[in-house]
Curated annotation (Swiss-Prot):
This is SPbeta prophage-derived uncharacterized lipoprotein YokB. It comes from the Bacteria. It comes from Bacillus subtilis (strain 168). A lipid is attached at C20 (S-diacylglycerol cysteine). It is found in: Cell membrane. The gene is yokB. GO terms for cellular component: plasma membrane. The lineage of its organism: Bacteria, Bacillati, Bacillota, Bacilli, Bacillales. A lipid is attached at C20 (N-palmitoyl cysteine). Residues 1-19 form the signal peptide. Its main location: membrane. It is a lipid-anchor. The keyword Hydrolase does not apply.
Length: 236
């Protein structure tokens, strides 16, 4: 494999593993001189390799960028043992990243479930919805938005009650804000975190010592005009 092709393989690895080349047609039939067992083994290997590339889009996309000859070389490379190792490693990395994200969201929801059960003082009768039936999204600001529901089991003649809620939580499992419709207290109103965060806080105007003296003198003159100078002196 010449230097140009090696560099092209490195540059186009993401292109192919991300789905930018089409599976080429089935490999040419093995040599007629090979025995039957070797032919079967070769066919199985080709099928396995084709399956890994089968979900890639049109070969024309690759040809448009790299040219037909080089794209065919790259396709053949990813059918080789070395190319398959790279594809397998890429799939493993994508699976690990997906699992890590899923686990993080589940961890967040486990904390949310615990908070919901403890919030109303009847944890033994409070049943949060399952993670699969809930919405957990990570926002651009790093906070997690949770939308779900819970059920409080009734006692005696009381019926079971069903409620929905939404919540904001950071990655350290701190409750930032929440909204529990029908409840009482702090979280009985819609969430206000975003509204407060986006409010413009007026700038505190700094007053110089000279300005303070002028303001103080103005106040004294006002008091004198109201109560008289003698009254002001007596109260100093």
């Amino acid at each position: 494999m010449n230097i140009r092709f090696s560099m092209l393989v490195c540059v186009s690895f993401i292109f192919f593993t991300g789905g930018c080349a089409e599976s080429s047609a089935n490999s040419n039939d093995g040599s007629k001189n090979k025995n039957e067992s070797k032919e079967e083994s070769s066919e199985e290997g080709v099928k396995e390799n084709d399956n890994k590339l089968a979900d890639t889009p049109n070969m024309d996309d690759c040809i448009e960028v790299y040219g037909k000859e080089e794209c065919e070389q790259i396709t053949e490379y990813y059918k080789s043992e070395e190319g398959q190792k790279e594809l397998d490693a890429s799939e493993t990395d994508k699976y690990s990243a997906k699992s890590q994200t899923s686990t993080t969201h589940k961890d967040i929801y486990e904390k949310v479930s615990w908070l919901v059960k403890e919030m109303f003082g009847v944890p033994e009768r409070t049943i949060p919805a399952d993670y699969e039936k809930s919405l957990v999204e990570k926002r651009d600001d790093g906070l997690y938005y949770i939308q779900s529901s819970y059920e409080i089991k009734g006692t005696g003649n009381q019926a079971d009650t069903y409620y929905e809620f939404e919540m904001l939580m950071d990655n350290k499992y701190n409750l930032i804000d929440a909204y529990f419709p029908g409840s009482t207290g702090r979280y009985s109103r819609p969430m206000v975190y975003d509204k407060l965060k986006n409010m413009e806080i007026p700038e505190v105007k700094k007053v110089s010592p000279e300005e303070e003296k002028r303001e103080e003198k103005k106040r004294e003159e006002t008091m004198k005009s109201i109560y008289g100078e003698e009254h002001i002196k007596d109260n100093k």
